[in-house]
Regions:
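C-terminal motif of bacterial Sec signal peptides marking the signal peptidase cleavage site
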Residues: 19-23
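Early extracytoplasmic/lumenal segment of secretory-pathway proteins
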Residues: 25-27, 35-106, 365
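Pocket-flanking alpha-helical
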Residues: 55-59, 77-113, 122-133, 228, ...
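A structural signal for short loop-to-beta-strand junctions that line the ligand-binding cleft
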Residues: 91-96, 114-149, 166, 176-182
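Periplasmic solute-binding protein
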Residues: 101-112, 132-160, 188-196, 278-284
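Short beta-strand->loop
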Residues: 114-122, 136-138, 166, 244, ...
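Ligand-binding pocket segment of bilobal, Venus flytrap-like solute-binding proteins
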Residues: 187, 194-274
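Mature extracytoplasmic/periplasmic domains
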Residues: 283-342
Length: 365
């Protein structure tokens, strides 16, 4: 997509002076090449660069099914999807993971997947099953793109942080927000889509004109926005950043706590939960998979309670399985987003380029 929290976490960890969690797949993990599963005992997962899982969870899959997972990492989600479209019918693996709701229609329109109803799908939240009638893809995780705020800044100024998109237009928040370019960054695109969802196709342009007049700053990507411009992040504090509002993720506060040394008792950042856009990531059985049985077993596993409970601290996303428990770090420091903004995947596919062009002409010309 697509630069979700998972893609950002390595940069955030670097800013905090430590290494991010290692990639999964062990000696079978690859970043290029591949011709699908080489044997019936290997199942190949094609993914964006930031798929991650604990070794114990991967070993449990092998013990339960007899299949060993090979992870073929292929850049960000958009680049990975493009490669699968180019190899349609002769896929590089058995399962593709990483198409989110901003890319879903493109993947489905290109006929990349063989329908399969994963075991345990009835335990998956109904609002994430965007292809429920055909089962071409299986929901795996959700995440929310939201404005984050620097708690210290607002406490020092005795100013309440913003809560909604409308709040960001108020004079009190002039010259405080930094966001990412919607044409080059997934969180930037998600924030734009959030304004389309809340203001409508007839109102989002007027919103952005007002936001520009209120001093919004636009930079190329998440790393620059969060680690260089945002005063609430570890990197921003080192850089003496002066923007206390940034477009990031609802899971950014737990990440700040997890990678801090020593760990604080309170997250230094908060989330404006009325500014969030919901992302849903999917996996699907690739049409022409060499190990279809292994691919089906892997899809079943991706929505198992074991894998779902492993995801939050490895990929910094939320589980879609209703009985999966969040780790205490997420419960204590994460934000609960009850009513995220959403846009139908087919509407995104039809209008994304037009929305981004209009946004660019208004904001970055």
């Amino acid at each position: 997509m697509n630069n979700t929290t998972k893609y950002a976490v390595t940069a955030l960890a670097a800013a905090l002076g430590i290494s991010a969690l290692a990639g999964c797949g062990g000696e079978d993990d690859e970043s290029a090449g591949g011709e699908g599963s080489k044997s019936s005992k290997t199942v190949t997962l094609v993914s964006h660069d930031s798929f991650n899982a604990s070794d114990a969870v991967l070993k449990a899959f092998t013990k339960e099914t007899g299949y060993k997972i090979k992870v073929l990492k292929s850049g960000d989600a958009g680049a990975a999807l493009n490669q699968e479209i180019l190899t349609k019918g002769s896929p590089r693996g058995d399962v593709f993971f990483g198409a989110d709701n901003t890319l879903l229609s493109r993947a489905l329109d290109n006929g990349l997947f063989t329908p399969y109803e994963a075991k345990g799908l009835d335990r998956v939240a109904a609002d994430t099953r965007l292809d429920a009638d055909k089962h071409r893809v299986t929901p795996v995780d959700t995440g929310d793109i939201c404005v984050n705020y620097d708690k210290k800044y607002f406490a020092d100024k005795k100013l309440d942080p913003p809560k909604t998109f409308d709040d960001l237009l108020k004079p009190a928040y002039k010259n405080l927000l930094v966001t990412e370019n919607a044409a080059t960054s997934s969180p930037g695109l998600g924030f734009l889509l959030g304004t389309v969802a809340t203001r409508g196709e007839d109102g989002y342009q007027d919103y952005w004109k007002k936001l520009k007049d209120n001093g919004v700053k636009v930079v190329d990507g998440w790393e620059q926005a969060y680690n260089d411009e945002f005063s609430g992040s570890a990197g921003g504090r080192k850089a003496k950043a002066d923007r206390p509002l940034v477009v990031s993720y609802a899971s950014s506060p737990p990440v700040e706590v997890l990678y801090a040394d020593p760990q604080p008792t309170e997250a230094p950042t908060g989330v404006a939960t009325g500014t969030c856009f919901r992302q849903i990531e999917f996996a699907g059985l690739l049409d022409g998979a060499k190990n279809e049985a292994g691919g089906k077993a892997l899809l079943d596993f991706l929505i198992s309670k074991r894998f779902q409970e492993d995801m939050p601290l490895n990929m910094f996303v939320n589980p879609v399985v209703k009985d999966a428990k969040l780790p205490e770090l997420f419960k204590k420091f994460g934000a609960t987003v009850d009513k995220p903004a959403t846009v139908a995947p087919e509407q995104i596919a039809e209008n994304r380029e037009q929305w981004v062009r209009s946004w660019s002409s208004l904001v970055v010309k």
